[in-house]
C-alpha cells in the first residue's frame, strides 16, 4: 500500500511526525504506523506542562494487535494535547496527519527538526518495511 505523507512533515525512525506551526511543533504518528497497528482502542498521552526529551517515551497507543510506545521526535514543553483522540481513538485511526494529531510542543531547539527524515525519505523507508 502506498502512503501519502505531507511534504512539510518531518519523521522519526519510530514513525512519529513533527510539523512546525509558527513557533510550535505538532506531533503525531504516521499513517503507515496507524495502518500497521490496526484498530486503535486506547491512547495514553502525558500532561500539559510536561517536558519531552527527544527519543524518549512519552505515551502509548494500544490497538487490537499490540501496545506501542510513542517516542518524542523533538525535545520541548508540552503545551497542548488532542483531547479528542483520548476519548475517540478512531480520530487517530481515520486522520493521523490531520485531526488525529497527538500533541503540541514548544521546542527547546527547533533545529532538531532537521535531524528527522523529510517526507520523501520516510516514504522510501516505509516502502521497504
UniProtKB/Swiss-Prot annotation:
Organism domain of life: Bacteria
Function description: The glycine cleavage system catalyzes the degradation of glycine. The H protein shuttles the methylamine group of glycine from the P protein to the T protein.
Cross-referenced InterPro entries: 2-oxoA_DH_lipoyl-BS, Biotin_lipoyl, GCV_H, GCV_H/Fam206, GCV_H_sub, Single_hybrid_motif
Family: Belongs to the GcvH family.
Modification type N6-lipoyllysine: residues: 65
Name of the protein: Glycine cleavage system H protein
Cofactor descriptive note: Binds 1 lipoyl cofactor covalently.
Domain Lipoyl-binding: 24-106
Alphabetical list of PANTHER family matching this protein: GLYCINE CLEAVAGE SYSTEM H PROTEIN (PTHR11715), GLYCINE CLEAVAGE SYSTEM H PROTEIN-RELATED (PTHR11715:SF3)
Keywords: Lipoyl
A GO biological-process term: glycine decarboxylation via glycine cleavage system
Known cofactor(s): (R)-lipoate
Cellular component GO terms, alphabetical: cytosol; glycine cleavage complex
CDD domains the UniProt entry points to: GCS_H
Subunit structure: The glycine cleavage system is composed of four proteins: P, T, L and H.
Gene3D superfamilies xref list: 2.40.50.100
NCBIfam families: gcvH (TIGR00527), PRK01202.1 (NF002270)
HAMAP family: GcvH
Amino acid at each position: 500500500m502506498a502512503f501519502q505523507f505531507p511534504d512539510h512533515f518531518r519523521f522519526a525512525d519510530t514513525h512519529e511526525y513533527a510539523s512546525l506551526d509558527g513557533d510550535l511543533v505538532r506531533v503525531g504518528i504516521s499513517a503507515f504506523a496507524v495502518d500497521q497497528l490496526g484498530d486503535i482502542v486506547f491512547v495514553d498521552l502525558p500532561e500539559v506542562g510536561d517536558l519531552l526529551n527527544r527519543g524518549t517515551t512519552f505515551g502509548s497507543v494500544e490497538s487490537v494487535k499490540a501496545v506501542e510506545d510513542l517516542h518524542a521526535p523533538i525535545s520541548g514543553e508540552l503545551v497542548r494535547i488532542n483531547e479528542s483522540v483520548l476519548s475517540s481513538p478512531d480520530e487517530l485511526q481515520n486522520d493521523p496527519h490531520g485531526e488525529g494529531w497527538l500533541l503540541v510542543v514548544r521546542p527547546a531547539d527547533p533545529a532538531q527538526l532537521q535531524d528527522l527524515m523529510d517526507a520523501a525519505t520516510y516514504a522510501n523507508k516505509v516502502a521497504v518495511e
